């Protein structure tokens, strides 16, 4: 494993902390007027999802985590596990509820996702930034009904609920931003 010093800390860096792989969310260098400089770091534990804040004195080191991000194709969900495959090697991985988390409402079969693996075990699933999903249920848009801000809830084929404009109807395919959960456009 490689060792990183506090001077090399940056957002997105994956390190080992207390035996668990973590990713750095924020890293702030603090140089007080009196005393030794230090780094204030926010880390997310990749196994539990818990966020912790730690301080490291200048010159301290951490071990990098042997974590890889791999593009995989989503195959299916068997009720307990979500199954993914590496398109080049056809190698399959099964991710549990903790790894999939909120991404499950955006997963559609055959979509390409990014899986974070630690010791060949999926820790996190990142859906594509934009997905195209079919609307299974939404209220009909009544002309002139814009007092509510010009939007209505729509249930998608994966079960996710998104606010859409009044002109969008049931059965249409829409593009959704998975990072914000917002409607982007209709798909022709």
From Swiss-Prot:
<comment type="pathway">
    <text>Protein biosynthesis; polypeptide chain elongation.</text>
</comment>
<dbReference type="InterPro" id="IPR014722">
    <property type="entry name" value="Rib_uL2_dom2"/>
</dbReference>
<dbReference type="GO" id="GO:0005737">
    <property type="term" value="C:cytoplasm"/>
</dbReference>
<dbReference type="Pfam" id="PF09285">
    <property type="entry name" value="Elong-fact-P_C"/>
</dbReference>
<keyword id="KW-0963">Cytoplasm</keyword>
<dbReference type="InterPro" id="IPR001059">
    <property type="entry name" value="Transl_elong_P/YeiP_cen"/>
</dbReference>
<keyword id="KW-0251">Elongation factor</keyword>
<dbReference type="InterPro" id="IPR013185">
    <property type="entry name" value="Transl_elong_KOW-like"/>
</dbReference>
<dbReference type="GO" id="GO:0043043">
    <property type="term" value="P:peptide biosynthetic process"/>
</dbReference>
<dbReference type="InterPro" id="IPR020599">
    <property type="entry name" value="Transl_elong_fac_P/YeiP"/>
</dbReference>
<comment type="similarity">
    <text>Belongs to the elongation factor P family.</text>
</comment>
<dbReference type="InterPro" id="IPR015365">
    <property type="entry name" value="Elong-fact-P_C"/>
</dbReference>
<dbReference type="InterPro" id="IPR011768">
    <property type="entry name" value="Transl_elongation_fac_P"/>
</dbReference>
<dbReference type="InterPro" id="IPR008991">
    <property type="entry name" value="Translation_prot_SH3-like_sf"/>
</dbReference>
<dbReference type="Pfam" id="PF01132">
    <property type="entry name" value="EFP"/>
</dbReference>
<keyword id="KW-0648">Protein biosynthesis</keyword>
<dbReference type="InterPro" id="IPR013852">
    <property type="entry name" value="Transl_elong_P/YeiP_CS"/>
</dbReference>
<dbReference type="InterPro" id="IPR012340">
    <property type="entry name" value="NA-bd_OB-fold"/>
</dbReference>
<dbReference type="Pfam" id="PF08207">
    <property type="entry name" value="EFP_N"/>
</dbReference>
<dbReference type="GO" id="GO:0003746">
    <property type="term" value="F:translation elongation factor activity"/>
</dbReference>
<comment type="function">
    <text>Involved in peptide bond synthesis. Alleviates ribosome stalling that occurs when 3 or more consecutive Pro residues or the sequence PPG is present in a protein, possibly by augmenting the peptidyl transferase activity of the ribosome. Modification of Lys-34 is required for alleviation.</text>
</comment>
<protein>
    <recommendedName>
        <fullName>Elongation factor P</fullName>
    </recommendedName>
</protein>
<feature type="modified residue" description="N6-(3,6-diaminohexanoyl)-5-hydroxylysine">
    <location>
        <position position="34"/>
    </location>
</feature>
<keyword id="KW-0379">Hydroxylation</keyword>
């Amino acid at each position: 494993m490689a060792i990183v010093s506090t001077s090399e800390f940056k957002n997105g860096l994956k390190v080992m902390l207390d035996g668990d792989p973590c990713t750095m969310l924020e890293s702030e260098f603090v140089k007080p007027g009196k005393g030794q400089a230090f780094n204030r770091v926010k880390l997310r534990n990749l196994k539990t999802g818990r966020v912790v804040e730690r301080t490291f004195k200048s010159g301290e080191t951490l071990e990098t985590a042997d974590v890889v991000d791999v593009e995989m194709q989503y195959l299916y969900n068997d009720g307990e596990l979500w199954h993914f495959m590496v398109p080049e090697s056809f190698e399959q991985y099964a991710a549990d509820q903790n790894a999939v988390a909120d991404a499950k409402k955006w997963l559609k079969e055959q979509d390409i996702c990014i899986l974070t693996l630690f010791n060949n075990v999926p820790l996190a699933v990142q859906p594509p930034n934009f997905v195209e999903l079919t609307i299974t249920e939404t209220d009909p848009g009544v002309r002139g009904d814009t007092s509510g801000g010009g939007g209505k809830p729509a249930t998608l084929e994966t079960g996710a609920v998104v606010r859409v404009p009044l002109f969008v109807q049931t059965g249409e395919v829409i593009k959704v931003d998975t990072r914000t959960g917002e409607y982007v456009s209709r798909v022709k």
